[in-house]
């Protein structure tokens, strides 16, 4: 599949979707995108910048949600212009898709909305590649009907994203088998290494996270074989306005990516058919 000018798939190198969880300010987005571009250029990694203009599913009703669509799109447009990278953002049921699609390169559907048929069709009809996040409550094989709904719109540029499965209360686990199962959708599979270590609602009025396990799960996913890695990152996760406990520090992204690209090359060198 062609995505933002480059090919993605199990026969292609790992690509990266990364950025802060939510748009906090113009300068933070530009600085983070600029640093990520430096790192990915150095390592030869295809990179898409991500950040959200509205986090509609915050634990607390008073938590920071973002600057809103109008201001958020201005920031993302400036990132594209100044840094020269493609951009991705989430959309919601109320989002004017055409307006967002006029700025961003990739649309993303929140995990909680994966079963909303009309929403999935609406997003996939906007004429942009779509990253569909698997719900924490959904089995990996249940992504097949979701993809069928998506592709029925005529959009063939669909990716599926694993972000962990609910395991009891306030906890997620990552079943690496799901990455192989979701290949049966015929779509590139992306692994979300940072939301997978989230502890949803684990801090009472906000979600916790186990950031130290990001490299563990990322390496495991790359060893299984994935097309892309999704990772939220921040210059200072302790001060992030959303999902700080599971965000990976920006200054540690290069070391992590370097390891992952080496693993990716070995995994894809040996192929997958003989293990099927």
Swiss-Prot record:
Please verify whether the record's keywords include Cytoplasm: yes
Q: In which pathway does it act?
A: Carbohydrate biosynthesis; 3-deoxy-D-manno-octulosonate biosynthesis; 3-deoxy-D-manno-octulosonate from D-ribulose 5-phosphate: step 2/3; Bacterial outer membrane biogenesis; lipopolysaccharide biosynthesis
Q: Kindly state which keywords UniProt assigns to this record, in alphabetical order.
A: Cytoplasm, Lipopolysaccharide biosynthesis, Transferase
User: One GO CC term of this entry?
Assistant: cytoplasm
Q: Which reaction does it catalyse?
A: D-arabinose 5-phosphate + phosphoenolpyruvate + H2O = 3-deoxy-alpha-D-manno-2-octulosonate-8-phosphate + phosphate
Q: What is its EC number?
A: 2.5.1.55
Q: Which GO terms describe its biological process?
A: keto-3-deoxy-D-manno-octulosonic acid biosynthetic process
Pfam families attached to this UniProt entry: DAHP_synth_1
Recorded GO molecular functions are: 3-deoxy-8-phosphooctulonate synthase activity
- Cellular location(s): Cytoplasm
Query: What does the similarity note say?
Result: Belongs to the KdsA family.
Name the PANTHER family on file.
Answer: PHOSPHO-2-DEHYDRO-3-DEOXYHEPTONATE ALDOLASE (PTHR21057)
- What is this protein called in UniProt? 2-dehydro-3-deoxyphosphooctonate aldolase
- Species name for this entry? Stenotrophomonas maltophilia (strain R551-3)
Q: Which gene encodes it?
A: kdsA
